[in-house]
């Protein structure tokens, strides 16, 4: 257990006094009190749920100052000092005496836990200084102490003050607005789209939650999440549409194309006229009931931020069709931002006879969300839309080709074999859930869906005009907002190439960019114990949306990475891709810095039918056995080459390049590679451990979240680091098809998904080479075999030692 805080702002003593006064921890005259007296007042105020003097005395009597005295007894006879302050402080932070720390020596535990402390406390000002910092310190639940006090009702004293602006403490907005009095309403933004071609601009349903004080004139910024999922999905119908993956890859017609041959150009279309605005009102006519929300958004609702959700075109109660990642979905998100910024019209109902402005908005917007949600945030940012001040995009797609394809191959997102753009469009076309609406829209949508099925081209797997229209990287130069990117280093759903390419493209754009890489798969991280992610984003949004001068841009690391070998360890870096490449040659069964005699290595792609069927139904078993050093069922179906045991820990940082001289027995084929960490070790679990179910309160009598953390699991012999796949007819790029003659050797270069991986001392680095990937590629079980000539076959590894 260790805590990593990056959002703790160091401020001068005078500012600490002012801020403690602002949140009522200091009252008039307190600054003249003796150190013991002011310390006791601080303690009493730290128990807002104990209302009377007797109740507070009881609470304080349960805090041990020493092995023999509680804090009340101690203060009656002794002066507060640093040891006692932090012995009590650790208890306030939720740590247990004897289990987590020693009352006689709290400092050793604080060093181990990576918690800040003040070495000396003698005078009143020392107490004030230390108390301010303690309020900002991580508790055992990962939240700071002030958040824990807020959850107990500390800030309810501000509810009746009719505040017209937030209160900030240590650069972060505090929960001074009553979540029991939030205003919930619905509007319909008129978009710049007519995706269903009914002669009317598509109206987009927007769900709003805002503080009650906005009705009294308070202007607030908005946290906007564009979520095609939030009003439900068509799981059953999408499942029926899933494409079969029981197909071999086929030879492709040789086509030497240039990028210009497949480049997307926006067609000239004439939009229907805007609806006339006859009446304008401030009063919404609809509210909303239940929807799936993002817990970070929930957390910010008490802190002076509005939260908005919109599904976009084709979702329940909106107009139009789902288009899976193209410009229509981008513009749908952009248009909501424009309404929040005062530059677009919305209506109170689908009848569209009363316009309603975002009169409560200060015009500033941040977008949040993971996966498709983060993708739409990225997409909206590439429009350069005014009012979008920042995005916090998590596990976001930057090019849809890199989600559903790779290297001229149809590739399934991890866990979803057979899914494609058309399936996702159907999945998210939640207009289908409204029978009356669906009756009018289903024929047109099904016809539109058939064009997606055709244009996505599952036959060749090549990059084409369809995918070029869904490549946000082309428009990164338009981005004007600052960006926080978050991604899992073990995410095989939205693969790391997406954030890696976006991060690199942003290098030429004059915006602030921050990158956080965690050890998770496709997850949120705002409920981690070891990282103050929520505080970091609160600091960031307080700066970006309220203009608070809190050094957020300087405090948050440019690149923050969770270590893969240790629990609760986060490290800062200045770059992702290593500039240094180490060359290791392929030999008969090894990787080495020395080139040995030339050999030809061979593997087959075909499996016995019973084995093939077994792996189709147990992909997890295949994923284990393809990497295992001894695996009788796959012995001839892959090559495993390993380095010597490492003499010291090595960091793999960025993409690796695998150069192979390879021949296919047939006139078509594919090659797949994995880099593997071989060595017995306890490794972080694949998913975070739930430390306490619903253990995180997100406010006072408000919503909850699970408290989680990655923990070292049982010992395993290996772990996949990264992988890549390539169609041998796409040796030069993803859009141009090359010739491939049977049994002829060709030089290919395979670029892996990017890495940030510590390879421990004594472990071996392994390269696994095979063809069909039972988790990701098509699975035809074809009678094909491959040969690799070790002449000219080697790895270029991005190693930093």
Swiss-Prot record:
Entry's localization field: Cytoplasm
Catalytic residues identified in the record: 371 (charge relay system), 491 (charge relay system), 522 (charge relay system)
Listed InterPro entries: AB_hydrolase_fold, Galactose-bd-like_sf, Pept_S15_Xpro, PepX_N_dom, PepX_N_dom_sf, Xaa-Pro-like_dom, Xaa-Pro_dipept_C
A single MF term (Gene Ontology): aminopeptidase activity
Catalytic activity field: Hydrolyzes Xaa-Pro-|- bonds to release unblocked, N-terminal dipeptides from substrates including Ala-Pro-|-p-nitroanilide and (sequentially) Tyr-Pro-|-Phe-Pro-|-Gly-Pro-|-Ile
UniProt keyword terms in alphabetical order: Aminopeptidase, Cytoplasm, Hydrolase, Protease, Serine protease
Source organism, top-level taxon: Bacteria
GO biological process, one term: proteolysis
UniProt keyword Cytoplasm present: yes
Keyword Hydrolase part of the UniProt annotation: yes
NCBIfam families reported for this sequence: PRK05371.1-2
Subunit structure: Homodimer.
Membership in a protein family: Belongs to the peptidase S15 family.
Function: Removes N-terminal dipeptides sequentially from polypeptides having unsubstituted N-termini provided that the penultimate residue is proline.
Protein name, as recorded: Xaa-Pro dipeptidyl-peptidase
Species of provenance: Ligilactobacillus salivarius (strain UCC118)
